[in-house]
Structures are given as C-alpha cells and as structure tokens.
Amino acid sequence: SDKANNVQVWLDKNFAQANRLPDLESAGFKPVSGRLTTTEQGAAAMVVYKDSEGRTLSFFIRPPGEANHLLPRGSRRDGELQADYWSGSGYNYAVVGPADDPAAQAARLALKQPI
C-alpha cells in the first residue's frame, strides 16, 4: 500500500542500512505511522502497525549502543505484552503486542519468516 511504502521511505531516510520493515500483511497488519525519537546511542523509531479490526502492534528500531550489543533472536513476555526481538544491519529491532491475542500471535508467526 502507499502508506506502508511511505513509512518505509521515511525509515530508509532516517536509518541508513537498516533492515526493511517486517512484512506482517499475512497476519493482517500494515504499517500506518511512525515516530522518531532519540536514545543515548542515536536516533530510534517506533512504527505502528494496525489491522482492519483496529488492533495495533509496535515495531521498534534503535542502535545497539556503545558496546555494539546486538541481540540474538528471542522473545520476552512482561504482563500482557510480548516483545519479539532480533538484530541485523547494525540495529536492534523489536515487535511488541498483546501476548495472548490471536492476531498478534499470527504476526509473530509471520516474523519467524526471513526478515
């Protein structure tokens, strides 16, 4: 979609060499907006994905920090939320959403495909 392409262009402009946005369309989620922020290590961003029912997931990208601490692929649950994370092309990434929501679980399965 045009909106997804616009979010990708915005991300490419702000994060040279970063991986492309995760394709979560097979789970019904499309990127709809993004926010740029800063960390001690440099620019970071959050991209919001939404499905046709209005459910949302958040995608985060940030630099790894001074020690260049890259993450192995993994997941972590905290209360009602689950984060699935990985590293690539010099950045750390995460997708965060409701842990027990079937739509979010379908998105997690889509993430397991090569990114």
How should these model regions be labeled?
Residues 1-115:
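Polar, acidic low-complexity tracts enriched in Ser/Thr/Gln/Glu with frequent Gly/Pro and Thr-Pro motifs
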